[in-house]
């Protein structure tokens, strides 16, 4: 969801003819080898000071994410969403606990109606140094509390 339209289209076309039935991808963009581009949209709008405002979701981003999840679902491919990761240059890995809670409650309430969703709390959670063990427990509690459909949940 954080690549250009051509690569996203190619990926979806490739998946359509592949044997895969689950794909993992991140809600937040990654800054990593082969992921150096600037995403077209981010999950949140910015406030007047240029900081992420988790109270103001960027609906273009969320609508696009839902569109991709729907396309995957039509191909009988489940979406394993990675909710946090350490490969960040935009500041999402360093959101305050109350910001993480706002983000998670919005995400789970919005996406849990999709039957083919898996929640991966993090990719390499042990490298997310900004979060304490207690914060990970709280993240798990929030997801379980908000997900009335009880989708699969993992820490990796």
Where are these regions (language model features)?
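Active-site mouth of glycoside hydrolases
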Residues: 1-156
């Amino acid at each position: 969801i954080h690549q250009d339209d051509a690569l996203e289209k190619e990926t979806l076309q490739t998946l359509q003819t592949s044997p895969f039935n689950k794909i993992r991808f991140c809600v937040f963009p990654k800054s990593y080898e082969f992921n150096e581009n600037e995403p077209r949209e981010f999950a949140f709008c910015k406030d007047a000071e240029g900081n992420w405002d988790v109270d103001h979701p960027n609906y273009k981003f969320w609508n696009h994410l839902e569109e991709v999840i729907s396309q995957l679902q039509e191909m009988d491919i489940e979406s394993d969403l990675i909710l946090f990761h350490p490969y960040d240059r935009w500041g999402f890995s360093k959101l305050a606990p109350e910001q993480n809670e706002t983000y998670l409650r919005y995400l789970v309430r919005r996406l849990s109606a999709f039957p083919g969703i898996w929640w991966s709390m993090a990719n390499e959670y042990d490298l997310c140094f900004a979060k304490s063990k207690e914060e990970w427990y709280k993240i798990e509690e929030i997801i379980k509390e908000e997900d009335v459909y009880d989708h699969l949940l993992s820490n990796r």
